[in-house]
């Protein structure tokens, strides 16, 4: 590989040459912080990823949480354009051009953006570090470049990333995680989240007090949860994890990070305890939803000392939910609060995958508080410590997203990204979004692919097929829809328990899908080998045990490889 490619350029045109070490088949680049003290922006490795229109190959960059997949950029004719995005789920990208075939791995101690450009018939890809926002220069920038064979496939790049992380102990196989009973159970059976109570979201009362707090709507009481469990049993659902959302004081997002006491309008503490015991007695598992990142002023645990401080010296208000304006809690304080609040929750005798909201779906905030400064690297370390602490306390751990720094001890992610849940994102540099995350991490953790694939049986044909092709764990949600006048990122069609007919319909649907999934559950333990985009809208997921799943993403019947595949249908073969 040509080392002249291993340079960076600052905003003044200055060229930065890294220290280079060759080790274990990789090039390790270090851009030393001492050389970056007066730099505002740094364009990283701009010479490494360039290709003329019409060239063979591709760039592959990771999705962020607003996207429906990872960006496969092929060098087809396009008008000049540029596309920039940041906060990616994975911290690596792939370059395959006539000159270079490499996996590029970026240490996650800074926030950075991907910039993909097409200009004068040339495609280019670089990452940009902006030291005027988020983190100032405080550490070296470290990048690993892994040379790949010239004909490397998506599966080869995924396998390289997975194997390196396994060897270094950054992740562990799902087979290892399944030695915990709750995780093995989750592998075989669906998740059923139940949103119980909430105030209007977003709330018209931005700064809530005990005097002006809006009414909480008690939609599913603890007694009603027992009815749902009975209906599941009556419909023959052999196993399920019921996860209660909005069980806490003032309901979902109502007073976070305050949890206790359980909301009286739902039945209070005694009814919660009764419900936990009841669900377990039926042979199901049960867990609760908590949140350490959001803080609203009405919480009895609220303190401004917990809140993230921006580079401008302002408290970081991020989110507008049932409790009004929410402020993000510094990672250092999130861990403190988890250790303060979660032991009381753990004493309730829960036996499912405890759910801490948000922590695995965002890159940790940069906090510039003088009392508790926390830059990205420290934030990630503290997030990992929080996940570890919570997992050891409850026995298993789940969260909202699947950021790669969280995966070692994340047993299940509610969705890899929001997909098109907030609307389709226009990405002018590609027309192909691929499941590179799933290709890399299937067999490492359980996940649901996107927020629209929650409640997948009642969603669009594309959502249902996406769920299957990307290897998801069945994930259902009673009352997923709760936002007023804003997008509901899990969709506008829903499962509800407002009357017995609706509840029993949902239970019957879950029973059918649980039975179908039973024959696929063992495949969760198997790595994906490749994911191929064929002609005629056929996509193929290939597993390392020889299993192949062919999906027809079109409205027309397709003949492929000796198989007839119905519109939006699929075929499994070995």
Where are these regions (language model features)?
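Hydrophobic, Leu/Ile/Phe/Ala-enriched alpha-helical segments that form helix-helix packing faces
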Residues: 1, 35, 161-168, 225-233, ...
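Carbohydrate-recognition beta-sandwich/jelly-roll modules
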Residues: 1-241, 285, 568-570
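Residues that cap or initiate secondary-structure elements
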Residues: 24, 35-37, 48, 248, ...
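Glycine-rich, histidine-containing beta strand-loop boundary motifs that form or position
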Residues: 33, 43-46, 244-246, 288-292, ...
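Intrinsically disordered, low-complexity acidic/polar segments
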Residues: 38-40, 251, 295-297, 559-560
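A broadly tuned preference for mixed-charge, low-complexity surface segments
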Residues: 77-88, 183-201, 283-301, 337-346, ...
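Active-site-proximal substrate-binding groove within the catalytic cores of carbohydrate-active enzymes
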Residues: 96-155, 211-213, 299, 306-322, ...
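Aromatic-lined carbohydrate-binding/catalytic grooves of carbohydrate-active enzymes
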Residues: 188-337, 351-353, 360-371
């Amino acid at each position: 590989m040509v080392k002249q490619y291993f340079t960076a350029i600052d905003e003044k045109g200055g060229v930065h040459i890294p220290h280079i070490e060759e080790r274990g088949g990789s090039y390790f680049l270090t851009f030393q912080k001492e050389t970056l003290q007066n730099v505002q922006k740094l364009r990283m490795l701009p010479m490494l990823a360039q290709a003329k229109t019409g060239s063979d190959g591709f760039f592959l960059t990771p999705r962020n949480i607003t996207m429906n997949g990872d960006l496969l950029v092929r060098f087809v004719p396009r008008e000049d354009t540029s596309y920039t995005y940041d906060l990616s789920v994975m911290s690596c990208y792939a370059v395959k051009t006539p000159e270079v075939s490499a996996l590029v791995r970026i240490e996650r101690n800074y926030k950075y953006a991907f910039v993909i450009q097409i200009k004068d018939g040339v495609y280019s890809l670089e990452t940009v570090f902006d030291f005027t926002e988020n983190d100032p220069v405080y550490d070296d920038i470290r990048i690993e470049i892994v040379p790949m064979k010239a004909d490397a496939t998506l599966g080869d790049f995924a396998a390289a990333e997975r194997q390196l992380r396994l060897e270094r102990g950054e992740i562990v196989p799902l087979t290892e995680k399944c030695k915990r009973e709750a995780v093995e159970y989750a592998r075989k059976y669906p998740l059923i989240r139940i949103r119980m109570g909430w105030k209007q979201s977003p709330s018209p009362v931005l700064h809530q007090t005990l005097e002006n707090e809006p009414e909480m709507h008690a939609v599913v009481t603890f007694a009603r949860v027992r009815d749902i469990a009975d209906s599941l049993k009556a419909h023959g659902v052999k196993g399920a994890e019921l996860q209660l959302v909005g069980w806490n004081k003032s309901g979902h997002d109502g007073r976070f990070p305050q949890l206790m006491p359980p909301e009286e309008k739902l039945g209070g503490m005694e009814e919660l305890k009764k419900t936990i015991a009841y669900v377990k007695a039926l042979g199901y598992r049960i867990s609760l939803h908590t949140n350490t990142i959001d803080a609203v002023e009405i919480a009895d645990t609220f303190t401004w000392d917990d809140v993230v401080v921006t580079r401008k010296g302002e408290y970081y208000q991020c989110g507008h939910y049932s409790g009004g304006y929410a402020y993000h809690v510094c990672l250092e304080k999130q861990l403190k609060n988890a250790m303060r609040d979660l032991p009381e929750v753990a004493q309730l005798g829960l036996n499912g995958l405890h759910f801490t909201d948000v922590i695995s779906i965002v890159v940790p905030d940069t906090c510039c508080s003088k009392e508790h400064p926390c830059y990205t690297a420290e934030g990630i370390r503290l997030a990992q410590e929080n996940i570890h602490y919570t997992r050891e306390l409850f026995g298993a751990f789940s969260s909202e997203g699947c950021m790669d720094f969280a995966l070692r001890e994340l047993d299940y992610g509610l969705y890899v990204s929001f997909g098109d849940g907030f609307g389709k994102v226009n990405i002018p540099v590609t027309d192909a979004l691929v499941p590179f995350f799933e290709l890399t991490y299937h067999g490492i953790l359980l996940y649901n692919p996107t927020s629209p694939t929650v409640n997948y049986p009642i969603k669009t044909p594309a959502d249902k097929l996406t769920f299957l092709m990307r290897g998801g764990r069945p994930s259902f949600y009673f009352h997923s829809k709760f936002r007023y006048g804003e997008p509901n990122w899990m969709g506008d069609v829903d499962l509800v328990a407002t009357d017995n007919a609706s509840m029993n319909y949902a239970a019957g649907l879950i029973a059918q899908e649980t039975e179908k999934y039973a024959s696929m559950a063992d495949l969760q333990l198997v790595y994906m080998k490749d994911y191929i985009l064929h002609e005629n809208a056929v996509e193929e997921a290939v597993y390392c045990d020889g299993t192949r799943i062919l999906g027809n993403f079109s409205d027309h019947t397709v003949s492929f490889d000796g198989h007839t595949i119905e519109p939006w249908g699929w075929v499994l073969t070995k």
